[in-house]
From Swiss-Prot:
Residues carrying Phosphoserine: S64, S93
Protein known as: Matrix protein 2
Biased composition (Basic and acidic residues): 71-80
Gene, per the UniProt record: M
Chief place where the protein resides: virion
Record's miscellaneous remark: When the channel is activated, one or more imidazole moieties of His-37 probably become bi-protonated.
Site (Seems to be involved in pH gating): W41
Amino acid sequence: MSLLTEVETPIRNEWGCRCNDSSDPLVVAASIIGILHLILWILDRLFFKCIYRLFKHGLKRGPSTEGVPESMREEYREEQQNAVDADDGHFVSIELE
């Protein structure tokens, strides 16, 4: 029998749960890991667009702008922002007439 499973047994015409090893450190650790995994999965599904956009565009460091005129820096920022905005439109809407 696995330490991580609960066994249902008939007790006096009722269904009960017999969990003898619930204080075992391995069971406690597995429960904590399972709960953390569930929380992270839910957060990932709720905020996946923000998270992956941050990883895709936010963590990339652009080239150094040392010695570059401000007008060229602004032009580069606009190009980068347009690239990010273009990525938002990956859904295609089709209108039927």
